[in-house]
């Protein structure tokens, strides 16, 4: 399996094309990247959770796309670290539950190691929240398991300004419940981003086979 870190923003539609090719050939790969301001609706989206008209989004330069991942509406924007994980569960004989639990555990352990920040999950509302204030969400998750090959993944709010979230009720919740490392007053510099990615690689390798690393 490869890990690829993109330093440039990747258009959301380009990612959708990439993940379809990866699934077609069942080619495992983990991607770290950022998107330009984008809103996506998952297979369980509620139209009422889109708070503005598509015409307004277009005028603000915000793209909107409908996807086959789980969940409702979420937002992507510069400064948010996105981790897309493409894993062949059938080949690895892994259950969906095991995969999800360990994906979230990898993020929890990595964030704790990087900032000494404690996060918790919520079985009733997927994602990761502050242990000190469970109403505050810092990480979204949405995964597609078509043909037992995963795509999509997690979006962690690092230094993004959260403005795009104001256009939606993220996963059915008020956008004011969203937070970021920057908003919490922690160091969000490039070196901390790199440290987080390094920790994520290590923790992902704890439940997946060794990964070959490349950059783009």
Swiss-Prot record:
Domain BPL/LPL catalytic: 24-212
Pathway field: Protein modification; protein lipoylation via endogenous pathway; protein N(6)-(lipoyl)lysine from octanoyl-[acyl-carrier-protein]: step 1/2
Residues that, per the record, bind substrate: 69-76, 140-142, 153-155
Predominant cellular place of this UniProt entry's protein: cytoplasm
Catalytic EC class: transferase
GO molecular function: lipoyl(octanoyl) transferase activity
Key words of the record: Acyltransferase, Cytoplasm, Transferase
Entry annotation: catalytic residues: 171 (acyl-thioester intermediate)
UniProt record, GO biological process: protein modification process
Record-listed E.C. numbers: 2.3.1.181
Similarity comment text for this entry: Belongs to the LipB family.
Protein's job: Catalyzes the transfer of endogenously produced octanoic acid from octanoyl-acyl-carrier-protein onto the lipoyl domains of lipoate-dependent enzymes. Lipoyl-ACP can also act as a substrate although octanoyl-ACP is likely to be the physiological substrate.
Miscellaneous comment as given in the Swiss-Prot or TrEMBL entry: In the reaction, the free carboxyl group of octanoic acid is attached via an amide linkage to the epsilon-amino group of a specific lysine residue of lipoyl domains of lipoate-dependent enzymes.
Name of the protein described by the UniProt record: Octanoyltransferase
């Amino acid at each position: 399996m490869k890990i690829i870190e993109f330093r440039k923003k990747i258009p959301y539609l380009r990612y959708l094309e990439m993940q379809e090719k990866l699934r077609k050939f069942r080619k495992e790969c983990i991607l770290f990247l950022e998107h330009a301001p984008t809103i996506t609706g998952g297979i369980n989206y509620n139209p009422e959770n889109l708070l503005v008209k598509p015409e307004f989004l277009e005028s603000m330069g915000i793209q909107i796309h409908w996807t086959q991942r789980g969940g409702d509406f979420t937002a992507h924007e510069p400064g948010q670290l996105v981790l897309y994980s493409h894993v062949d569960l059938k080949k690895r004989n892994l259950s969906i539950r095991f995969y999800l639990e360990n994906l979230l555990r990898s993020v929890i352990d990595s964030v704790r190691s990087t900032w000494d920040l404690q996060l918790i999950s919520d079985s009733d509302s997927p994602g990761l929240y502050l242990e000190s204030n469970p109403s505050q969400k810092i990480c979204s998750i949405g995964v597609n398991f078509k043909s037992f090959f995963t795509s999509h993944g997690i979006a962690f709010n690092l230094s993004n300004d959260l403005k795009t979230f104001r256009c939606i009720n993220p996963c059915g919740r008020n956008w004011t419940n969203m937070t970021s490392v920057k908003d919490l007053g922690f160091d969000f510099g490039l070196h901390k981003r790199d440290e987080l990615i390094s920790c994520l690689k290590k923790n992902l390798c704890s439940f997946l086979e060794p990964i070959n690393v490349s950059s783009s």
